[in-house]
Curated annotation (Swiss-Prot), chain A:
Keyword Magnesium: no
Ligand binding (ATP): G38, P39, S40, G41, C42, G43, K44, T45
Every ABC transporter domain range: 6-236
InterPro entries named among the record's database cross-references: AAA+_ATPase, ABC_SmlMolc_Importer, ABC_transporter-like_ATP-bd, ABC_transporter-like_CS, Mo/tungstate-bd_C_term_dom, P-loop_NTPase, PotA-like, PotA_ATP-bd
Molecular functions (GO terms): ABC-type putrescine transporter activity; ATP binding; ATP hydrolysis activity
Superkingdom of the organism of origin: Bacteria
Subcellular location: Cell membrane
Stated name of the protein: Spermidine/putrescine import ATP-binding protein PotA
Keywords: ATP-binding, Cell membrane, Membrane, Nucleotide-binding, Translocase, Transport
Length: 370, 267, 274
């Protein structure tokens, strides 16, 4: 395994009685796109600031390429930040902003000019060097903020919710561009966001955070398909979360019935929660139904109908269907065993991973025919 | 109808505001010796003024005190504003601001009288030194008040960004903070200058016998009655104020234009 | 920001700190200290007992406050409509500049101008003669003192009211109209309450100086009106009774604190309603 570029070992941050970060461990490898994802106030920006050097960790170590950098001031760290409000210097032109860090390093004028031009080309604003910051649109300011950081050739680029001030269309475009930029530069990006779609779309690996803790880390697909607990399942994507009970390995009961599932290694009769994504539910006639629900309302979302329904036990269901349903109708729902995901209460990420080890492989054989 | 009333009201107010000034300057060109009955045009009073060596020395003193005190007050006030802006505790900041504003709201006589006691106790001789110190003292708070809002406008992330790009504390100050707040510093200097030129009461208390500024001189001459040399002086001072205001707005316009030129490049 | 900026930077704060100690705290302390000493430099409470026992001093104080109130009232009555109308003009910033410009003329020159205007054969009496009233003694009367003081203070009242009007979100006015309020109702129920902080700032800027305008009482009022400021100046520079002067100074400081408290912004601190 190669040397990780950034490591956090048991980092905590406290202000008086408030714990902002508790026991954060994380490892970032070179050249990957990482995302810290969580609701506002979960501590994700604080992690970014401890890595950048704007905030001290109360305890724990921050390592850069294996060396402890807790006591290295921000201006001596080889990481750069793109700020949420861009933080461009209003009294300087675009080029002066981008050149700022290089000027402080007293680089030769020709080198500065060339690197500034190169950085501006990278963000597709090559001709904008002479403009005032106030003359740029939000999207352009965003790009300049990125150019100003990457011109420093950092090994790690920290991005603090950089897209949050942009409109939806521009944000989607910037997602592609950021991903593209990261791959071209080949450096590590650590991206902070509260927008799960953004995180799923761009990241190699996501850290889901809540209340100062990292709850789960993994690839976007892993986290979407196998959320570790109620919070993660609810925060990422839309989901139906129902109380249930483990009957046996690969057998779970909920909604008054017993179903085949893809999870094992949980003690028999343990109360659990079951996650089913709305797009995994299929409308069917009552004869083929695994569950029967009554349609309450539906909204047309363009590429699908979002249907709200209630089952006989009073559980609410959210269904994404290509075909519309009729309000008030009784209708059948069906799903595949691997569409169910069983979550244990209070299970930690390490325990979850260990349990998965015990039955993985068998799972793939079982449902091959479907 | 309503429009008419509004206009009439404003016209009357402006006439009242400017009548005394126009009256004063008009009579500086009158051949008589009193401010009654205009006696025809003359430059005589201006000639008297410009050959009055005592008056010219006082003008020089006044300008020297104003410039010197404003420069020093701007320096100290800016540093003070930086300090106040750095305080994190709300209580500390509020009490510093309250103390800062004491001299802003105190009546001139209180400032003058208390400074007089202060200088006498420290055995500082009354004259140029005491006047200069007093002017610096009452100019500092206005500089702080002009600089602070600019400092507050400065976002914390901008300072983080500068550090992130490698700026040391010194570079942070010289390349980011000072350029950013320079409009505030400039306005502070300017306000300090006008406070100094305008002050009468404080100077009157702490000036002693040997030293005089324009305000004090005008007061003592006005108590002796009408003297059209003072009218001529007010003409000169009005022109000077106009130039100062004009210059101030011109500089603001230029910096605005510079911004706009850059902005204009977009289309 | 961490360690990087914490160190040594407090050195920059020293000149300002010295100023606070020597020119803000010390002088106030000294004037209070001095008020407890008599002419022979002995500690005494006599200054205060003299002040509160003497009809002359008390009458002077009441007079001074009364004149300051009148000046503030007249200034406000003239300034609010001026600021309001001014704010409706197209080039309002330019007109505001014209209001501020006279404040750049030395106050003594303006007072001096009125000596000319109000003199026996001056402009004002020529006008009175012209309309048939005949010449009057105008200079050295209480009325002339109030007139000139009001004249001098008007811009200082207009400015904060204008700024308050400028800060007012026009959407509030539209909302009020939308809800059926007439122009007058909109003014009384929306505009005036929301610009009250400007009026209070104006009162602060006018009332306190009006208590202490000693040069106007000398030049225009002809020593008929004795304000607190005049009394202080008299004691410090003429009779050299600094103890008594300081005592009146302390009274003036207390008056100032009362005015500041009454007109201070009553934003509920900590959200507790009062």
């Amino acid at each position: 395994m190669t040397q990780p570029i950034i490591e956090l070992h048991q980092v905590t941050k406290r202000y008086a009685d408030n714990t902002i970060l508790s026991n954060i461990n994380l490892t970032l490898e070179s050249g990957k796109f990482y995302t810290l994802l969580g609701p506002s106030g979960c501590g994700k920006t604080t992690i970014l600031r401890t890595i950048a050097g704007f905030t001290d960790a109360t305890t724990g170590d921050i390592l850069f390429a294996g060396k402890r950098i807790n006591d290295v001031p921000a201006n001596k760290r080889n990481v750069n930040t793109v700020f949420q409000d861009y933080a461009l210097f209003p009294h300087m032109t675009v080029a002066e902003n981008v050149a700022f860090g290089l000027t402080l390093q007293k680089r030769p004028k020709s080198e500065i000019a060339e690197r500034v031009n190169q950085a501006l080309r990278l963000v597709q604003l090559a001709d904008y060097g002479d403009r005032a910051i106030s003359a740029l649109s939000g999207g352009q300011q965003q790009r300049i903020a990125i150019a100003r950081a990457i011109v420093m050739q950092p090994q790690v680029l920290l991005l603090d919710e950089p897209l949050s001030a942009l409109d939806a269309k521009l944000r989607r475009q910037m997602q592609y561009e950021l991903r593209d930029l990261q791959q071209r530069l080949g450096i590590t990006f650590l991206f902070v966001t509260h927008d799960q779609e953004e995180a799923l779309a761009m990241s190699d690996e996501i850290f889901v955070m809540n209340q100062g803790e990292i709850l789960q880390s993994g690839s976007p697909v892993d986290i979407y398909d196998e959320p570790i607990n109620h919070f993660v399942a609810d925060f990422i994507g839309e989901s139906n979360i129902l109380p249930g009970k483990m009957i046996d390995d690969f057998q779970v009961a909920f909604g008054g019935h017993q179903f085949e599932c893809a999870d094992a290694g949980i003690p028999v009769n343990e109360p659990v929660e079951i996650v089913i994504r709305p797009e995994d539910l299929t409308l069917t006639d009552l004869a083929h139904a695994k569950l029967t629900v009554t349609i309450n309302t539906q909204l047309f979302r363009g590429d699908y109908y979002e249907i709200a329904a209630t089952d006989g036990l009073g559980n609410d269901w959210l269904i994404h269907s290509v075909n519309p349903a009729e309000d008030g109708d009784q209708i059948g729902l069906t799903f595949r065993p691997q569409d169910l995901h069983v979550m244990r209460f209070g299970e930690k990420e390490a325990e979850f991973d260990a349990r998965l080890e015990t039955y993985e492989g068998t799972e793939d054989d079982r449902f091959d025919e479907t | 109808m309503k429009q008419k009333f509004t206009q009439l009201y404003l016209i009357v107010v402006f006439i009242i505001l400017y009548a005394p000034i126009v009256f004063l300057i008009a009579y500086s060109f009158s051949q008589g010796d009193t401010m009654t009955n205009y006696h025809g045009f003359t430059w005589r009073h201006y000639q008297t003024l410009f050959s009055d060596s005592r008056m010219l020395a006082i003008v020089a003193n006044t300008l020297l005190v104003a410039l010197l005190s404003s420069l020093i007050a701007t320096l100290i006030g800016t540093l003070g504003a930086l300090g106040i802006n750095r305080t994190t505790k709300r209580v500390t900041r509020e009490s510093l601001l309250t103390l800062n504003n004491v001299l802003m709201v105190s009546p001139d006589v209180i400032i003058g009288a208390s400074f007089l006691i202060f200088f006498t106790m420290l055995k500082i001789p009354l004259g140029f030194g005491s006047v200069l110190l007093s002017h610096i003292a009452f100019e500092i708070p206005i500089v702080v008040l002009m600089v602070l809002p600019r400092l507050r406008e400065m976002s914390a992330s901008m300072l983080d960004a500068a550090q992130d790009l490698g700026a040391t504390t010194r570079q942070l100050l010289s390349q980011v903070i000072i350029p950013f707040i320079s409009p505030g510093i400039f306005a502070g200097f300017f306000m300090a200058l006008t406070y100094s030129l305008d002050d009468f009461a404080v100077t009157f208390f702490v000036t002693g016998n040997g030293f005089s500024t324009l305000s004090v001189e005008i007061y003592s001459r006005a108590r002796q009655g009408i003297n059209l040399e003072i009218n001529a002086l007010s003409g000169v001072m009005f022109l000077f104020s106009l130039l100062l205001v004009g210059g101030y707005y011109w500089i603001q316009q230029v910096s605005q234009k510079r911004k706009q030129r850059k902005r204009g490049a977009i289309s | 920001m961490i360690a990087l900026t914490k160190r040594k930077t407090w050195l920059y704060f020293i000149p300002y700190g010295l100023w606070l100690a020597l020119f803000v705290i010390a002088p106030v302390a000294l004037i209070i200290y001095q008020s407890f000493f008599d002419l022979g430099h002995h500690f005494t409470l006599a200054n205060y007992s003299t002040y509160f026992a003497s009809a002359t001093y008390l009458k002077m104080t009441v007079n001074s406050v009364w004149y300051a109130l009148l000046i503030t009232l007249f200034t406000g009555l003239i300034s609010y409509p001026t600021a309001y109308f001014l704010h409706q003009l197209k080039h309002r910033q330019f007109w505001l500049l014209l209001v501020i410009l006279p404040t750049w003329i030395n106050i003594l020159l303006k007072a001096y101008a009125f000596i000319g205007i109000f003199s026996q054969a001056g402009l004002a009496n020529q006008f009175l003669t012209f309309i048939g009233i005949g010449p009057q003694q105008i200079l050295f009367t209480n009325a002339s003192f109030i007139f000139v003081a009001t004249y001098i203070q008007i811009p200082f009242m207009i400015l904060p009211i204008f700024n308050a009007l400028d800060d007012l979100n026009p959407a509030f006015i539209n909302a009020s109209r939308d809800l059926g309020a007439s122009n007058w109702q909109t003014f009384r129920r929306v505009i005036f309450p929301l610009t009250l902080p400007g009026v209070k700032a104006g009162v602060q800027a006018v009332f306190i100086p009006s208590l202490s305008l000693f040069m106007l009482t000398r030049l225009i009022g002809g020593n008929k009106v004795i304000t607190l400021g005049t009394a202080i100046e008299e004691h410090f520079l003429t009779t050299m009774n600094w103890g008594m002067g300081s005592t009146i100074g302390v009274v003036l400081i207390i008056a100032m604190i009362i005015v500041m408290t009454l007109t201070g912004d009553q934003k509920p601190k900590g959200g507790a309603p009062r």
